[in-house]
Amino acid sequence: MDLEKGKKPSEQAAACRIMQVKDKLITLQPVVRACVFLATAVAAVIMGLNKQSYTTVVAIVGTRPVTQTFTAKFKDTPAFVFFVIANAIASGYNLMVLVTRRILQRRAQSLSVHLLDMVILTLLATGSATAASMAQLGKNGNLHARWNPICDKFGSFCNHGGIALVSSFIGVALMLALNLLSAAANSPRSNVTGQ
């Protein structure tokens, strides 16, 4: 019957396989989005609660030591504040899309979600990169600017920041994968007949 219509049976099978692959890509998106939500939420919470105090002796008056307490908080560095905000926005956005995904099934709405996914990916990547540069500065210092490293005194602060950074970069990688899945699922149906 296909030969009467001018189609080859292999073309119809290829079109069916393409639709099956697209269906698998569409069903995989909520799983990846949930993983992005978890990774970015963990990063935002860990960095948002990151605080450590360090007490040291600054002078000795007679026989009595004078101490001073230094505190490292994420709020002290604008890059870490941006990191927390970017991860919070990304986790909130992904949660919102997960909750409303049944409503967003039409192609036009799916394309707007794809465009917003790219914006969130950019926001998340820049937040992670700025925090990583400040974390590197805190760990190694900058000898040319005479900025000493602080991770030898604030070890817990640096460890928690590192965990938050790893979680955020996992979120960036998953968000990139989600963008690729979304682009493949939203691509127009290919012309199998070659016309």
Swiss-Prot record:
Residues 1-25, 100-114, 182-195 are cytoplasmic. Its main location: membrane. The keyword Cell membrane applies. It comes from the Eukaryota. Residues 47-78, 136-160 are extracellular. The chain crosses the membrane at residues 26-46, 79-99, 115-135, 161-181. It is found in: Cell membrane. It is a multi-pass membrane protein. It holds the Pfam family CASP_dom. Keywords: Cell membrane, Membrane, Transmembrane, Transmembrane helix. GO terms for cellular component: plasma membrane. NCBIfam families: A_tha_TIGR01569. Belongs to the Casparian strip membrane proteins (CASP) family. Homodimer and heterodimers. This is CASP-like protein 1B2. It comes from Oryza sativa subsp. indica. The lineage of its organism: Eukaryota, Viridiplantae, Streptophyta, Embryophyta, Tracheophyta.
